A protein has these predicted regions:
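PLP-dependent aminotransferase-like
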Residues: 107-164
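Short acidic capping loops at alpha-helix termini that bridge into adjacent secondary structure
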Residues: 36-37, 87-91, 111-114, 158, ...
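Glycine/Thr-rich phosphate-binding loops of Rossmann-like dinucleotide-binding domains
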Residues: 49-51, 101-104, 125-126, 171-172, ...
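N-terminal small-domain helix-loop-helix segment of the aminotransferase-like
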Residues: 2-96, 103
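Active-site pre-lysine segment of PLP-dependent enzymes
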Residues: 148-158, 170-193, 197-228
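Short hydrophobic alpha-helical segments of the AMP-binding
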Residues: 80, 125, 129, 187
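Short glycine-rich anion-binding loops that position phosphate/pyrophosphate groups of nucleotides
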Residues: 44-46, 97-98, 122, 166-170, ...
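Short, structured coil segments at secondary-structure junctions
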Residues: 87, 132-133, 217-218
Length: 228
């Protein structure tokens, strides 16, 4: 008799579970440490805790927890659109940027297609690609950063998505806007370029750029940001 798990696609069964940043409570329990002596740096978390304005906003929002929230995020999209100078209908919300990355993969990848990303890429890229049954085309890094010329050579007729983290996670390397724009101009229009800017706010002032304005120039560009 066939096992229930054998009925799922082979590419799903081959996925190794994603290992998120270990909670401090787990480290304390496993190693018998004082929680006040443990410093966690792995998950981009604020060690200072919630600010007073955030606490007040949460308390106010708690008054409406008996109701489902607006599934389309109308108010949040309106404020984000005003902040970034785009239209609300250009914004997609997710449960963290991981959710947006996975939605992009599910929307554009399937068996017989492929996604291109760097040798040192965010762990979610290969997982999201494999979860759709697509092939991962991994481009060797140059000095721990993205080789955009290598990306262009790797793109073929079956490439549907290119993932680029800038600044890159986990290497911390950065591509200036001139290189990104030159790359975008050469990417075929059938390929979705996902520009993952989860660490955008960490850039030096002289390195900062506004990629949200590029989406009007490149219809195949998706810019991902994160509140974390």
């Amino acid at each position: 008799m066939q096992k229930l798990t054998e009925q799922s696609p082979e590419f799903i069964r081959a996925i190794a579970p994603y290992k998120a940043g270990k909670p401090v409570s787990d480290v304390v329990r496993e190693l018998g440490l004082d929680p006040n002596t443990v410093v966690k740096l792995a998950s981009n978390e604020n060690p200072l805790g919630l600010g007073e304005k955030a606490k007040a906003a949460i308390a106010q929002a708690a008054m409406d927890l008996g109701r489902y929230p607006d599934a389309n995020g109308f108010a949040l999209k309106a404020k984000l659109a005003a902040r970034h100078g785009v239209k609300p209908e250009q914004i997609t919300l997710g449960n963290g940027s991981n959710d947006v990355l996975e939605l992009a993969a599910k929307a554009f990848l399937t068996q017989g297609t492929n996604a291109v990303f760097s040798q040192y890429a965010f762990a979610v890229y290969p997982l999201a690609t494999q979860g759709c049954g697509a092939q991962s085309k991994v481009v060797p890094a140059v000095c721990f950063t993205h080789d955009l010329d290598g990306f262009l050579k790797a793109i073929d007729t079956q490439t549907h998505v290119v993932f680029i983290a800038n600044p890159n996670n986990p290497t911390g390397t950065f591509l200036p806007q001139e290189k990104l724009l030159a790359f975008l101009k050469q990417v075929p229009s059938h390929v979705l370029v996902v520009l993952d800017e989860a660490y955008n706010e960490f850039l030096k002032p002289e390195d900062q750029y506004d990629s949200t304005q590029w989406v009007s120039q490149f219809p195949n560009l998706l810019v991902s940001r994160s509140f974390s």
